[in-house]
Each structure stands twice: as C-alpha cells, then as structure tokens.
Amino acid sequence: TGYVGCFPTEFIGSGSGSASMLAVALAYVAVFFAVGAVATRSPKQPGPAKKHHGLELLDASVGYGSTTILSIGSLFLSPGTAAGLVAPNGSGKTTLLEALSGQFPTRIRSGSLAADGICQRRSAEFAELVYLSSSGGADLYPTLSAIEHLAFVREAWKSAADIDSLCDSLGISPYLDKPTRKLSTGMKQQVKLAMAIATGCPYLILDEPLNGLDPGKRKTSCDAMRSEVARGRSVLISSHLLDDLADLTNSFYFIEAGTLVEKIKSSSQTLKQEYLDTYEGGE
C-alpha cells in the first residue's frame, strides 16, 4: 500500500518513469469514481461517543534511511488539548510529524507509538484515529474540487461531519466547486484544514496549517481548531507564527540539539524570547 496525497492506495508502486505515471493516473481515476459515489451521500449518524486516552510516542528515535535525527523521551497528547511544535527549518519537525501519523512507519527507528492504546503496528485501526495534514499541496489532487476532497475524506473515515457547516465556518463555501489547482495557497490551506476536521479523527497532526494565510484567515483557522479542541479532539501544530501558537495551544515542544523538549504554557512574548534564547543566542 502506498499513498497519493493523504489517501492510501494499492495503485502506487516503487517503479519510475511511464509506469509510475500510469500508476498515479490510475489512482486519480480510482479516487474520482470513489468521490463521485459518495459526494451526495448524507453523513453517517454518530454512534455512542468513544472514550479517548491520548496519543503517545515513548522512548523513541526518529529519522529516515540510516540517519537518526531526533530523540524523544515522551510526547503525549491528551484528549482536548492543543500543542505546538516549534523549531527552525531543518530541525526535523516534518519527520517527527510523519512518524506520529503512522503513515511512515520507517520514521520510527526505536520506541513505541500508540493512540488510545492501539499500537501503530495495527495500522488500519491506528489510521482511523490519527490524521496528518502535510505542508505544501501533497494532500490535494489538482483536478478534483474542494467539495470532492471533503466528501472523500468523510466517507473514507466514516465521519459524521457536517460539511456545509464546516465550510461556512472556514469561509470556503464560495470556491468548493473549483478544482484545487485553481485555488490560491491560502485557499488550499483552508481546504486542507477542513479535510482534517472532516475526518472526525480524534488526533490531528497539522504541519504549518497557517502558512500563506492573511491575518483574518489565520484567525478563522485558529478559531476552527480551538472549537475542535473544545469538542475533545487533540491537535499538534507546527508553525513559526508564535503569536498564534501562544494563543491557541496548551503546551509547546521545542527541538533542541536533536532532542524533543516540552515547554510549559507561556505568553506570546515569553515564547518569542525563549525561541530567541534557544535558537539564536538570545538576540
């Protein structure tokens, strides 16, 4: 099983050239028909609420290939909390987020990862609980519309999300029918956040979700994330926008010399100063 965007597919192999291009084309076709079949369905009615216990990475080393880049004693996301991940570019933030998602099992070189007590090795069950929204446009199919993406993730994760209300709250309703290749960077970011919320997953891992947004749209996105946390979901957010992170999150993780370090909740000014002290020698 491979991935096209954020969606698992059996079509993707390890080949290259025309064979890989054909595989990707087939994956697009498969998703197109899947979306067409579910786009007009009503969401499933929610069943009894499930009790969540947290997402935990313990005594782990994280990296890629033969390289270990991070050591983690403990990273724990309890239900109904938001945490920030703060570090300069190239420190390993994205690698860590990929490891936490379970989509990239080779990122975890040692240690254990579990969501609600379900080990990442039980990948199908784990994938129902944890969703990664990656940076850039890798989560989006350029020829499919925003509403098709949302319908697909709602069905794939068997979610009861109210797509209309979600789109209204994020202000993306006016361009739902546009193919994502015609959307601006900010519009794509909001569609990706809507997709993450629409999955219904209790644990959302968001890589730079506020990049490319103007101040008004950043506030809208932060309000949406805050609402999901109030409903009991857990959110881990990487960002360089320290003011927004300080306002949104309960705690922070810094990456210091290849080690993940948890910080206490602090004000925006304190967080900025701690960032400067840690990474820029207190300038």
Question: What would you call each of these model-derived segments?
Answer:
Residues 132, 142-156:
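Q-loop/switch helix immediately C-terminal to the Walker
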